[in-house]
A protein has these predicted regions:
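Loop-to-transmembrane-helix transition segments
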Residues: 1-4, 50-75, 141-149, 194-212, ...
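Helix-helix packing/entry segments at the starts of transmembrane helices
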Residues: 89-94, 163-179, 214-245
């Protein structure tokens, strides 16, 4: 689920980069939330209570999550207006490390030592790829947008984990969509550009893809800890390079390729180490039982 969600977010960001050349961030994000809300309410009109209840015992967390989602989408839309897709994602790849820190600080989750080590290795891969880009004159404004968007994204993922005890997924779409629609409406109105047929299709697709990707990531982080899943978010690096080349014709430099290899290695080794750590206590318990 995590891998599919990340792939869909890559497609979403590629589509957003195309849209950013013609439409304001406010208009694109507004229509994204309109689409999400319309799909959810339409589904619930056909199947009552589809996705579970909209009520929650944690209104503050849902409100904070909605704000984090809104600013994450808005900031990344602005970032990709100034940056190549792969470069924006290089900044995004600090999210797994931030997620581990937030899970440890706010959720009091025990993070295995192996997860810290291999996420650190993955973060090092990001640095390898990013430093030459900064020295090459990359937009600092775009990088700033991407960094702030990454912090918002990590906050969203951490809150998803904190809300894992709540059954149903409808509220995960409803409240952020409602807030986004209300918050962006006046800004979208002031900067409205009438879309053509292709524009409507792309703007609507943004909402559909965003909703599907959000649900997949929420499900993934409800069924596994950030410590285990966070390193696998780094797989978005090679995926963004592929999209950047296929859609925009941008060829990655040697530093990006090298950094990407380090990141993928960190993903694989982290999973191997976490599985080994999870099995070790059970083996010790079995040995003690036999004794």
């Amino acid at each position: 689920m995590l891998m599919t969600g990340i792939a869909m977010f890559g497609v979403l960001d590629a589509n957003s980069k195309i849209l950013s050349a013609e439409y304001s961030a406010a208009q694109a994000i507004f229509l994204r939330h309109v689409t999400l809300l319309a799909l959810l309410l339409g589904l619930r009109a056909l199947w009552r209570e589809a996705g579970g209840s909209l009520r929650t015992r944690h209104p503050f967390l849902h409100g904070l999550r909605a704000v984090a989602m809104l600013f994450s989408g808005l900031l990344f839309f602005l970032a990709f207006r100034h940056l190549p897709l792969a470069l924006g994602y290089l900044v995004f790849f600090t999210a797994p490390f931030l997620t581990l820190v937030m899970a440890a600080l706010f959720l009091r989750e025990e993070v295995p030592r192996a997860a810290w080590i291999w996420s650190g290795v993955g973060f090092g891969g990001v640095i390898i790829a990013l430093v030459p880009q900064i020295g090459g004159g990359a937009s600092l404004l775009g990088l700033g947008y991407a960094l702030l968007g990454t912090i918002c994204y990590a906050t969203n993922i951490t809150i998803n984990r904190g809300l894992r005890a709540e059954a149903g997924l409808a509220r995960l779409i409803f409240w952020p969509s409602l807030l986004g629609l209300i918050a962006m409406a006046p800004f979208a109105w002031g900067a409205w550009v009438p879309p053509d047929a292709e524009g409507w299709a792309r703007l609507t697709a943004n909402g559909v893809i965003a909703g599907a990707a959000t649900l997949l990531l929420a499900l993934a982080f409800r069924h596994a800890s950030p410590a285990r899943l966070a390193p696998f978010e780094f797989i978005a690096l090679p995926w963004s390079v592929v999209l950047d080349y296929v859609v925009f014709g941008n060829t990655p430099g040697l530093a990006v390729i090298l950094g990407g290899c380090v990141v993928v290695l960190a993903c694989l080794m982290s999973e191997r180490a976490v599985i080994a750590a999870a099995r070790r206590p059970s083996r010790q318990g079995t040995s003690s039982g036999k004794a």
